[in-house]
């Protein structure tokens, strides 16, 4: 958001040419400097709400709000037992209004704190994932985001409606997953007990919800076992370290069944020895290596702007105007000048 200040009525100020100056002044919105971290039960704190991925700060602020609510309840008990004469509140109406105000305020603070604690106890929080992602992005770009407020300048947090939609979708998925696990737990256990199958990785076991992915994995595993047994028994039967030099010579001379591809270039993308069995490990590998950035750096591309039409109308107008200019007055003028000199 900005404010546009138009130039003066004279166009050029102090005789300066307007071609080199820029009269546009952009004033940033002051609200953009105020952190706007989302929350369910800490809205009373306004811009002091910490980032959604800063769990220690959220727990501290929630505990502080609960403490203020409990102090309000203690104030209500104190007002009930004392006559409040020493505080200058001798009127019964003032005493009752103060008591009810403390009771309502304390109840509201404790209730809001309970809502916030329930959000922090949830295993999935879209606000947490969003704040954590942009904090990592800011650190990767060389910035130092605030420990309390997070990377507020990199994104605008999602609103409550979008957050609620994602939470509702996640709950429905979890319900479907639990129902599917209860239905297939007996069949899966019987299959594993009868067949001595290869154990699944944690990532694959998390994907095998209704048995589809586990069946695909088992079929691929069995086909791979058959393939490498066939290779070891047939084409790779005589392959060992003793005849390695001889085999390499035959490959380089082109006399082997294995052909050497001289145009092959080894890809630059290397993931190292990192495991990606869990979502956290996969996210760490993806953020550190960024395969799409590697591919973008190794891809050469040219951009050419080709016009879709030719501006022939102006050229035709100029040509017709030059043809229609008469040349006789010019020749007469030259003759008159020559006669005057004579």
From Swiss-Prot:
The chain crosses the membrane at residues 57-73, 100-117. Residues 74-99 are mitochondrial matrix. It is found in: Mitochondrion inner membrane. Residues 1-28, 317-342 are annotated as: Disordered. Residues 8-21 have a biased composition (Gly residues). The keyword Mitochondrion applies. Residues 319-331 have a biased composition (Low complexity). Keywords: Membrane, Mitochondrion, Mitochondrion inner membrane, Transmembrane, Transmembrane helix. It comes from the Eukaryota. It is a multi-pass membrane protein. GO terms for cellular component: mitochondrial inner membrane. Its main location: mitochondrion. Residues 1-56, 118-342 are mitochondrial intermembrane. Component of the mitochondrial inner membrane i-AAA protease complex. Component of the mitochondrial inner membrane i-AAA protease complex required for mitochondrial inner membrane protein turnover. Belongs to the MGR1 family. This is Mitochondrial inner membrane i-AAA protease complex subunit MGR1. The gene is MGR1.
């Amino acid at each position: 958001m900005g404010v546009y200040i138009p130039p003066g009525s004279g166009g050029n100020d102090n005789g300066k040419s307007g071609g080199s100056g820029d009269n546009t002044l952009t004033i940033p919105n002051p609200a953009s400097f105020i952190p706007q971290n989302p929350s369910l039960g800490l809205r009373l704190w306004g811009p002091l709400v910490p980032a959604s991925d800063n769990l220690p700060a959220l727990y501290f602020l929630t505990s502080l709000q609960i403490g203020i609510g409990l102090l309000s309840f203690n104030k209500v008990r104190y007002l009930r037992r004392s006559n409040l004469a020493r505080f200058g509140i001798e009127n019964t109406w003032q005493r009752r209004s103060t008591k009810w105000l403390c009771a309502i305020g304390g109840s509201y603070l404790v209730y809001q704190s309970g809502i916030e604690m329930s959000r922090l106890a949830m295993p999935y929080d879209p606000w947490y994932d969003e704040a954590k992602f942009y904090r990592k992005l800011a650190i990767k770009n060389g910035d130092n985001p605030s420990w309390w407020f997070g990377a507020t300048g990199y994104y605008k947090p999602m609103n409550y409606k979008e957050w609620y939609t994602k939470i509702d979708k996640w709950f429905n998925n979890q319900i479907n997953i639990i129902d599917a696990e209860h239905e297939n737990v007996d069949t899966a256990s019987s299959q594993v007990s009868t067949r001595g199958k290869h154990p699944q990785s944690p990532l694959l076991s998390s994907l095998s919800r209704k048995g589809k992915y586990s069946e695909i994995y088992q079929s691929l595993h069995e086909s791979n076992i058959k393939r490498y047994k066939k290779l070891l028994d047939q084409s790779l039967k005589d392959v060992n370290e003793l005849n390695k030099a001889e085999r390499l010579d035959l490959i380089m001379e082109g006399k082997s069944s294995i052909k050497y591809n001289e145009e092959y270039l080894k890809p630059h993308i290397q993931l190292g020895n990192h495991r990606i069995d869990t979502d956290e490990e996969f996210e760490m590998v993806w953020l550190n290596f960024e395969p799409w950035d590697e591919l973008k750096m190794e891809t050469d591309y040219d951009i050419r702007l080709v016009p879709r039409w030719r501006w022939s109308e102006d050229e035709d107008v100029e040509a017709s105007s030059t043809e229609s200019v008469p040349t006789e007055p010019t020749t007469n003028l030259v003759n008159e000048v020559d006669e005057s000199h004579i």
